[in-house]
C-alpha cells in the first residue's frame, strides 16, 4: 500500500514530453513519473498493468521520435536512476539505467579502464544503450555487456547477454516487455590512465568535428546498410540541407536530422520518409530508421 501511495504523490498528468527528448518535439504524456529506485519502478509498472495502461520508458530521450499527439498510458523517465560501481578485482562495472553514457565513459577513462572509449559521444543513458545495442568507433554494448537486470510482469529478473539476442542496433528488449534497471559491463582495468584518456578524447573530438551538436537531433537517424554508409548515400542524393518545415537534413552529416527551431514530429517523420524514398529511387537501397517512433503519426508514403 505504501508504494501505491508514494506513486500517487509523484504521478503527474498531461506532461509535455518535448523537453525530455533530444529532438525537442513530442506531445503530452497521459501520465508521467520519474522513479528514483527499482522498487518505485516496480510499483509504477504494476499500477500501469493493473490499469491496463501501456508503459513507455525514457532515459536521455535520444534516438526517439515522439508523436505530436503525445503518448497514452504511463511514461516512466529513468533519468534519476544513476550511479556506477567499479570493481577493481574483476573489471566489472555495475551501472544504473539512467547513468549518462558519456559520463560513464569518462569515469572509466580516468581510472585507466579500457572498453568504453567508443561510447564517449553517445547521447544517451545506459538503459537506452543496452536496449539499442548502441555503438560507435567500432565498438558496441554487445562487446562489453555481461548481464542486465530488468523488471517484467514477473518481477525483477537477471538476463544474460545471450538472452538479449544482440544484433546490429537490435535486442529483444526493443519489444518493450521489460524495463532495464541496471547492467554489468566487463571492462579492462590496469591500462595507463593517459593512454585511455587520449583515445577517449580523440574519439570525442572526432564526433564533435563530424556530427552536429549545435541543434536538437536524435543522433544517427538510419542504420548503415553495410557495407555502405547511410550518410554517404543520402549525401550522394544531394539531400544535405533539404528541409520540411523546420526539420532539416544536416549539412555537416547527412545521417542526422536537425530541429532548426520549431519542427514538429510530423515534419521530422515526413523528412525521414522523403530521404528513404529518394535513396531507394537512386540506389535501390532501403534505409531502415535507427530512431524509434513512439505514438501515433500520420505516416507518409
Curated annotation (Swiss-Prot):
Domain FAD-binding PCMH-type: 24-190
Main localisation: cytoplasm
The keyword Flavoprotein belongs to this UniProt entry's keyword annotation: yes
NCBIfam families assigned: murB, PRK13905.1
Subcellular localization(s) per the UniProt record: Cytoplasm
A single GO molecular function term of this UniProt record: FAD binding
Keywords: Cell cycle, Cell division, Cell shape, Cell wall biogenesis/degradation, Cytoplasm, FAD, Flavoprotein, NADP, Oxidoreductase, Peptidoglycan synthesis
Family note: Belongs to the MurB family.
Domain of life, per lineage: Bacteria
Cofactor requirements of the protein: FAD
Catalytic activities: UDP-N-acetyl-alpha-D-muramate + NADP(+) = UDP-N-acetyl-3-O-(1-carboxyvinyl)-alpha-D-glucosamine + NADPH + H(+)
PANTHER family (alphabetical): UDP-N-ACETYLENOLPYRUVOYLGLUCOSAMINE REDUCTASE
E.C. numbers: 1.3.1.98
A cellular component term, taken from the record's GO annotations: cytosol
Gene Ontology terms describing biological process: cell division; cell wall organization; peptidoglycan biosynthetic process; regulation of cell shape
Pathway: Cell wall biogenesis; peptidoglycan biosynthesis
Pfam hit, one: FAD_binding_4
Organism expressing this protein natively: Synechococcus elongatus (strain ATCC 33912 / PCC 7942 / FACHB-805) (Anacystis nidulans R2)
Function: Cell wall formation.
Name the record gives this protein: UDP-N-acetylenolpyruvoylglucosamine reductase
Residues of the active site: 169, 220 (proton donor), 290
